[in-house]
Amino acid sequence: MTPAPFYAEVADGPEGGAAHWLTTSDGLRIRAGHWTGGTKGTILLFPGRTEYVEKYGRAATEFLTRGYSVLAVDWRGQGIADRMLNDRAAGHVHHFPDYQKDVSAVLAHARALGLPEPYHLIGHSMGGCIGLRALYEGLPVKSAMFSAPMWGIIIAPALRPFAWMSSWTARRVGQGHRLAPGTEPVTYVMSTPFDDNTLTTDRAMFDYMKAQLSAHPELALGGPSLHWLNEALMEMRRLAARPSPATPAITFLGSNERIVEPSRIHDRMADYPNGKLVMLDGAEHEVMMETPAIRTRVFNETTAWFDAHS
């Protein structure tokens, strides 16, 4: 195993956190970070777009306190994993199913580290899209938690055909690397005042995210490329056409969600035979980084779900 940088001072997580470089089957270098000591099992934590291992340091403390070790990942194209374009600010992936190669590398790493089983999945936002695909492909977890999963993206109905057409056209005329309309190269938390943000109502957690990127700007990522947008739209459509997997899953959704499409989540969970949807009154997109009361509820109900399905 090759050690990778791990920024413990900004993660603010449990003692002993560490990171390693992983090589995917297509030769890319991604990063995985872990916090060990929980003996009930291990959480495979799939972050959202723009995110990185250290963002979940405080969440790891909560999970470790409740008995679970945590393994998180910098997906290809973000964090300090290999970026996919010369323009490091643009979020990009060649093909959305490529993220499953990262999943395979993370799973092999969990086994190489000897992390305690059973495994459970947490998928936040884009990680919820990747995680749902991984469940269909046989990810060996006993249960899952989805946090505001990206099973749809909020796009005004009048603009939805334009999003499909512009993203499809851009990639076919060699312009797929350009940022999607309405996005910018500066990462969201660095360009948006707290009072205008759509991530959390908790100022302390917003400042925590901002401080991480101020200290380590190499972790930052701007808006998605048009190519990424087209790939994401196609993947979400493919997933929506499939029945829910058998893996038991609890899903958390804030009542103020303004990034992913709530109707897609309601539709999925209404027809999920081993699923439960928990609505969080007043919460925005980042339910694990919300107010203390909301965070505590999420961590308690998540680990109770894992306990019941181990």
Task: Cite the ranges covered by each PLM segment.
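Alpha/beta-hydrolase active-site loop
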Residues: G91-R111
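Short beta-strand/loop motif that positions the catalytic acidic residue
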Residues: P245, T251-L253
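Acidic catalytic loop of the alpha/beta-hydrolase fold
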Residues: N256-V260
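Conserved alpha/beta-hydrolase
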Residues: V53, A60-N86
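Short alpha-helix in the alpha/beta-hydrolase fold that links the catalytic acid
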Residues: T247, E261-A270
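Alpha/beta-hydrolase-fold enzymes
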Residues: M126, G131-H216
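Catalytic active-site module of serine/aspartate enzymes centered on a nucleophile-bearing elbow/loop
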Residues: K276, D281-S310
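An N-terminal hydrophobic leader/cap segment in hydrolases
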Residues: M1-T23, L28-W35
